[in-house]
Amino acid sequence: MRLLPAALLLSALLSAFHARAAGPMKLADYLALEGPAPSAKIAYGAALSQYAELFLPQGTGPFPVAVLVHGGCWTSKFGGIGQLRNMAGALAARGIAVWNVEYRRVDEEGGGYPGMYLDMHAALDALRAQAGRHPLDLARIVAVGHSAGGQLVQWIAGRARIPATSPLHHPQPLPVRAIVSLGGLADLRGEAALIQKSCGRDTVQLAGSPSAARPDVFADTNAAELLPNGSRTWLVTGELDTISPPRVAHDYASKARAAGDVAEVVILPGASHYDEVAATSFAWPRVLQVIEQALELAPPRP
């Protein structure tokens, strides 16, 4: 693993110290996040929001890959992909390639159900195609999602269990067996009231309307009902997260373990919903450690 220069390491430590002194991040702090420009911007569809940003580390590779999926309550109101460049740049500096995914949200044409799920399929198919052009190690992938993006990456892990009759079925999905959900809201059925309270989103927007052909709208959209999926999931939540409180992580982990999957809950002391996703937050070293552990680049924390 490449070591950070002493000056850069000192700068990172000072940033973390000042961030802790300033207290938990707020929404305005999150919206102000920024990071470096990507190595490439690659369209995976014709719509304006159907693209991903590729961040390549220095060196020859092949590089492990972090797929980043932003949150924002499934809307374009709260930014998203631009804010995740902050994390993307920090990961690339650690030798991890990043595939930062934009997608159609509920307030965009074609977004919501089924569009945003089909966008996840298309974005991962495009990543697979990029492996033929860039030194990417697709045997080492972690999907990292924040908030609404946590729902989508946890859904990604269960894609192989989607019934063949579903509009969301993919015959050969790219396997993603390591998931890091940062303040995710993945259980669409079980957390429907919280999702409505935190984000103002209802079931129809996120899971579609029931029909004779599809009576249970959660059978192909709810990550909690696509278990077991053979993945290992880290559910990372700020102690002070009010959008997706720690209880949500513990409840999902219990369901995953009961189904036979491996799930670990990581609570970030003193952290908010927005500290979970910022490389400039005092919580970042622990989040980074989880991501590197998911990629088998770091040992488990005692």
Regions found by a protein language model. Give the residues of each.
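N-terminal cap/lid segment of alpha/beta-hydrolase-fold proteins
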Residues: 22-60
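Mobile cap/lid helix-loop segments that gate and shape the active-site cleft of serine hydrolases
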Residues: 26-37, 47, 158, 190-225
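Short amphipathic alpha-helix adjacent to the substrate-entry channel of hydrolases
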Residues: 80-99
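Alpha/beta-hydrolase active-site loop
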Residues: 111-132
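Primarily recognizes the serine-hydrolase "nucleophile elbow" in alpha/beta-hydrolase
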Residues: 125-194
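Short beta-strand/loop motif that positions the catalytic acidic residue
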Residues: 235-237, 241
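Conserved alpha/beta-hydrolase "acid-adjacent" motif
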Residues: 242-251
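Catalytic histidine-centered segment of alpha/beta-hydrolase-like enzymes
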Residues: 271-281
